[in-house]
Amino acid sequence: MTYVVGYGPHNNDRSAIELACQLARSVPGDVRAVSVVPQGWGTPAAGGTDREFEAWAAGEGELSAAEARDDLAQHPTVEGSAVWVSDRSVPHALLDEAARSDAWMLVVGSSGDAERGRIRLSSKTDRLVHSSPVPVAIAPRGYRTDHPVTRVTVGFRDDDASWSLLARIAEICHRASAHLRVATFVVAPPRRPVTARSSHTETQVIDLWKAQAANAQREAKTYLDSQGFDEPSLEFAIAQGPDWGRAIRMLDWEDGDILAVGSSATHPVARVFLGSSATKIIRYAPVPVVAVPGAATQGRA
């Protein structure tokens, strides 16, 4: 089982390797860091200029791979390796390497302008996340931990994609001996005094959402009970806030937590095509996020 890590040249943030090694300690596997450098033009007209560029790129690749090996050496219990490849597209190169390595997960870091402890997708990472056929784990900037994965929170919407996600994450939690938390996020404005028909209707709609979420979570509990989960290792939460950031902050988050989100329920392709809710959850998540592709109906009781 292989974790392929995107590791950029002159990387000053080893968060992706840190997360990959944490995952590899929890669900055992090897970590393969891949640095992607620009590819030459490959045309006769380029001549010596192209050769000079390729020599420069090779030097950058060797340097980056050496830096990745140094970072991997900080995790002696994890089997690690580092390579560099040349390509015109970083997402394409990482997906190629994932296919070649038969990787079960890609791991990437956040954009260089992300706040420390937060996730922000660069344009390259965004394209990767939306096109990958395998799960993509995203580390917050500056991520460091000595803990294994101790709890996975599933963003649960009670649609086919969520049930598929729940089934896959339940299996991973068993393998990692991690707790599982099923969380439904409800974003609604603060309640106002019922002084008009519109505000009364708004209150009724929010209450209906929460009742539906509670019913769906009871159904999820029945399914998870059948998969061997017991009370100490299983949690349920409905987190409500006036915006996504505050809804997510309603939950407690600890070192060792991972948040899992699924692909859009309406997208026809088995890829990590994130809907607006998953994208916002990623933006405000205070812990690493795993985006999981697929919208199969497995797991529904």
Model-identified regions with their sequence ranges:
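Small/aliphatic-rich secondary-structure junction motif
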Residues: 1-51, 77-80, 151-206, 227-235, ...
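Structural beta-alpha unit
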Residues: 12, 55, 70-106, 225-259, ...
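Active-site phosphate/pyrophosphate- and oxyanion-stabilizing loops and adjacent acidic/basic residues
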Residues: 21, 70, 95, 126, ...
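Solvent-exposed polar/charged
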Residues: 22-25, 99-100, 130, 174, ...
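A short acidic, glycine-rich active-site loop
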Residues: 51-63, 202-215
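Glycine-rich, Arg-bearing micro-motifs that act as flexible, cationic patches
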Residues: 105-127, 149, 243, 258-284
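Short beta-strand elements of ligand-binding domains
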Residues: 107-110, 135-142, 289-293
